[in-house]
Amino acid sequence: MAIVRAHLKIYGRVQGVGFRWSMQREARKLGVNGWVRNLPDGSVEAVLEGDEERVEALIGWAHQGPPLARVTRVEVKWEQPKGEKGFRIVG
């Protein structure tokens, strides 16, 4: 079971639609650690850390997001795991 860390930037209609709260719920359901926050440019940034398969599943979810979101692009950058604990909304 490989532990991985993915740094995401999510673009589209992703603020004001419950994206962060929904991502937190999905992450906790999957057992993925990390954080999510809104950025001033209207995008959402997230760091996901955990079992590779579960992180991949949450990245897949991020391409869709919650029902009111309209995701146009997701950028993923793979990084070294840093030992995130829990999943939180920051900023």
UniProtKB/Swiss-Prot annotation:
Enzymatic reactions: an acyl phosphate + H2O = a carboxylate + phosphate + H(+)
All copies of domain Acylphosphatase-like, residue ranges: 5-91
Assigned keywords, A-Z: Hydrolase
Record EC number: 3.6.1.7
Enzyme class: hydrolase
Superkingdom of source: Archaea
InterPro entries in alphabetical order: Acylphosphatase, Acylphosphatase-like_dom, Acylphosphatase-like_dom_sf, Acylphosphatase_CS
Record note on temperature dependence: Optimum temperature is 98 degrees Celsius. Poorly active at 25 degrees Celsius. Thermostable up to 100 degrees Celsius.
Entry annotation: catalytic residues: 20, 38
Pfam families noted in UniProt: Acylphosphatase
Record's keyword annotation contains Protein biosynthesis: no
GO molecular function, a single term: acylphosphatase activity
The family this protein is said to belong to: Belongs to the acylphosphatase family.
PROSITE patterns membership: ACYLPHOSPHATASE_1, ACYLPHOSPHATASE_2, ACYLPHOSPHATASE_3
pH and activity: Optimum pH is 5.3 at 25 degrees Celsius.
Organism per entry: Pyrococcus horikoshii (strain ATCC 700860 / DSM 12428 / JCM 9974 / NBRC 100139 / OT-3)
Gene name of the encoded protein: acyP
Protein name per the record: Acylphosphatase
Assembly and oligomerization: Monomer.
